[in-house]
Amino acid sequence: MPPAGAAPLSYGIENDIQHPVYARHGMVSTVDETATGVGLDILRAGGNAVDAAVAVGYALAVTHPQAGNLGGGGFMLVRTRQGETVAIDFREMAPAGATRDMFIGPDGNADSKRSLTGPLASGTPGTVAGMSLALDRFGTLPLARVMQPAIKLAREGFSVDKALADDLASYGREALINHPNSKAVFFKADGQPYAEGERLSQPQLAHSLTLIAEQGPQAFYQGAIADEIAAEMQRDGGLIGKADLAAYRAVARQPVSGSYRGYQVFSMPPPSSGGIHIIQILNILENFDLAHMGAGSADAIQVMAEAMKFAYADRSEYLGDPDFVKVPVQALTSKAYAKTLAQRIDVNRANPSVTIKPGQLQPYESDQTTHYSVVDGQGNAVAVTYTLNTYFGSGIMAGDSGILLNNEMDDFSAKPGVPNMYGLVGGDANAVQAGKRPLSSMSPTIVVKDGKTWLVTGSPGGSRIITTVLQMLVNTIDFQMNVAEASAAPRFHQQWTPDELRVEKGFSPDTLKLLGERGQHIKVLPVMGSTQSIMVMPDGTFTGASDPRTIDDLTAGY
């Protein structure tokens, strides 16, 4: 197979969405300009990519509270200069008091209000444990040093950007307004949310961050912060207790990996479904000449959409927390299995979802997670996707800690066979169980070429994370786009149920008409995903791009 074309070193036009940012020594790509600056400062000060990634994670908890967090969880993928790749799972866990039917209402149906908005919605947070595990194993700077910028931002405040102002005015009014502690932080005395350009300080969060910096993660899991979280839960009828917090552990796992046209792809293993299904879909696509079909062509979209259907059907049946259920990783990611699925794809006629597996109900979908990527000049690379689940999580702030808590329990299958808020159907493998981690679509991904890191990428977007990351890989490898072109190209999504091909604006009307004639049910939707990506060039320099769909994000290097 011919290797993918390398992105040009620099066009010298950094504000053009078709041209990447260029740097020689290190690069950071995040959803927030301030957090990107924090990461770069750590790199310039001699820290490595993991040091910078941990600093960014804590900074985003201050400046991007929609998804950046201490009270949530996520996944980190680390590739070291020595060529070791490790997946760090800091996904939230169901508290000990959680039961399989806890979100089933009196009518026998799943009650999404309880799994999204109430005190029962929160799982035991993992972010603080995950960041410390990464830093202890791969970092070079002390925790107090990498947390210093976040503490300063929380204590002294920062200028609210348009993205945060808009989200406070919309989602914040829903999620935060009914919780006095949260309202006191994000809304002013006159009842209005902080607006663009106004200064937002969070002294309580600064205090919590300082405790973690001084005492380590035990401050969060066994100390004063644990007391605040447990008391808040007890007050409101939540389940997280001090024993749940003390028992939480982040886990280093073997990443899922596969090959695609000569490239090695590493991504998250279960409890993320992302890595398995990205590799499964790539394995199917390897049976087709996408480059010949062409980017944005009806043939390429048809083949990719059909491959997506098969993967999402399998997701509903087989995926869950590997500590509780046996996930058939090898079978799902085998080339032989993919070939049998590829043989069922007709470029001229779509397979109705009902012929693959029964689908049901209409989903709701939004970009409510955040992803960032970091590389350094020594050959280390980090991809992180973490979240509170929906914007601002449950909206509940733990006492006087300044920490927003997640509503991640909605990612379990409250009633197997019935979609969650992202329209994703789950089976018994993802049923609620004490101590279990809910299934996720988060897919921090690193692509390796000739033994060296080539692409670091990921995205928010609920169920669309998998297909967004997939299209970044296909755009760069098959269609030979540079990292900025690949980020800007219009996206599409098919998740098996409902049986519709969701497309962004930007595709040719003739192409969409052709796809409709081939049996695809087209639905034009707003933008999908928010990739933050970095590509490493053959000479070791970097090109990067933040998604043009997102305001106030920034990729920068030095």
What are these regions (language model features)?
Residues G5-G37, D41, A49-Q215, F220-Q222, ...:
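Noncatalytic scaffold domains of N-terminal-nucleophile
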Residues F266-G275, S373, T385-I396, P444, ...:
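Glycine-rich phosphate/pyrophosphate-binding beta-alpha loops
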Residues A252, S366-T369, Y391, S440-M442:
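Short, small/polar residue-rich loop motifs at catalytic or cofactor-binding pockets
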Residues F288-L388, D400-S401, E408, P416-G417, ...:
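Internal maturation/activation junctions in enzymes
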Residues K415, K436, D478-P526:
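Extended C-terminal subregions enriched in glycine
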Residues V62-A87, L239-G241, A381-K449, F479, ...:
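Active-site rim segments in enzyme catalytic domains, especially the processed small/beta chain
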Residues V56-A61, G238-I240, A350-G359, Y422-V432, ...:
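Short Pro/Gly-enriched beta-strand edge/turn motifs at strand-loop
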